[in-house]
A protein has these predicted regions:
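C-terminal accessory extensions appended to soluble enzyme cores
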Residues: 237-265
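Conserved AdoMet/S-adenosylmethionine-binding subsite of the radical SAM
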Residues: 60-231
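N-terminal [4Fe-4S]-dependent radical SAM core
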Residues: 1-77
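Generic structural signal for helix capping and beta-alpha/helix-loop junctions
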Residues: 40, 118, 207, 239-240
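Short aromatic-enriched loop/helix-cap "lid" or pocket-rim segments at secondary-structure transitions
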Residues: 44, 184, 242-245
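Flexible loop residues that form catalytic
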Residues: 38, 203, 235
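A C-terminal junction/extension of Radical SAM enzymes
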Residues: 2-4, 227, 232-234, 238-239
Length: 265
């Protein structure tokens, strides 16, 4: 693993790659989606379906001129922060992984609430790309509470897919809506999944739901005990006030570790 560094900002990415825009609700984490709010603000008369059709881009690998956006070649790139690239409306989400695998100067973050489809799609990645060109890629899923953490990890497609030891897996516990034990019970045995990174944060926005500070503290302690880098993005203070300013955090939660070191800067 690259040496850890403390990230200076609440946003852990510096650039985005959005070949699709628009999404569909799948779990409680989606209820106050910021991407949906942005779309309503700037496209008030456009439905999500219309936006999906308008911004859907071709999945072809053939090098030719088209309307297809290319991913940024450097920086820390959040791939699909205005959609879920592993939603069933995206025909070949793994095609974007192949494309970003050609960019060696950046760091590429993929995040989904449909982890089963991500695992299924990753089977289609050519072995040479999988083995030699994805060290700067991080594949993660959202877990808002214990129920959905377990649901996403225990789906058959996830359980049947074996990520290589060198794969960079991460979990986004944001918005955190309940306590989470990052261990899992399989056949009576507690299994600790191997993660490269964990992000945790309270929900933001005027309709934000409760996020107890002890829930965040628990995840931080679990990560410390397991030697997993952890990034505390934003919290609700005991007063009830939301903040993403790290100097307002309790001192023991002023942690914004990223596992890629200076790569992507």
């Amino acid at each position: 693993m690259t040496d850890l560094i403390q990230w200076p900002k609440a946003a852990y990415w510096s650039r985005t790659f959005n070949p699709w825009i628009g999404c569909k609700k799948v779990s409680p984490a989606c209820d106050n989606c910021y991407a949906r709010a942005i779309m309503r603000r700037f496209c008030p008369n456009t439905s999500s379906t219309q936006l999906l059709r308008a911004h859907a881009l071709e999945n072809s690998f053939t090098p030719r001129q088209s309307a297809q956006r290319r991913p940024p070649k450097s920086g820390v790139v959040f791939c699909g922060n205005m959609t879920d690239l592993w939603g069933d409306w995206v025909p070949l989400p793994e095609a974007y992984v192949v494309r970003t695998s050609q960019c060696k100067k950046g760091v590429y973050l993929y995040l989904t609430k449909r982890f089963d489809r991500m695992c299924k799609g990753m089977r289609n990645i050519p072995e040479d790309i999988y083995k030699y060109y994805l060290s700067n890629h991080y594949f993660g899923f959202t877990a808002e509470n214990q129920e959905w953490y377990e649901k996403r990890l225990k789906l058959r497609e996830v359980s049947d897919f074996s990520w290589p030891d060198w794969a960079n897996l991460w979990v986004s516990c944001e918005p955190l809506l309940g306590p989470i034990d990052l261990g899992l019970m399989f056949d009576g045995e507690v299994v600790k999944p191997k993660y490269s990174w964990v992000v945790v944060g309270a929900e933001s926005g005027p309709k934000r739901r409760e996020c107890k500070i002890e829930w965040i503290e628990s995840i931080v302690e679990q990560c410390k005990a397991a030697g997993v880098p952890v990034f505390v993005k934003q919290i609700c203070l005991p007063s009830g006030r939301f903040t993403n300013k790290i100097d307002e955090f309790p001192e023991h939660l002023r942690i914004r570790q990223v596992p890629w070191g200076n790569h992507g800067k």
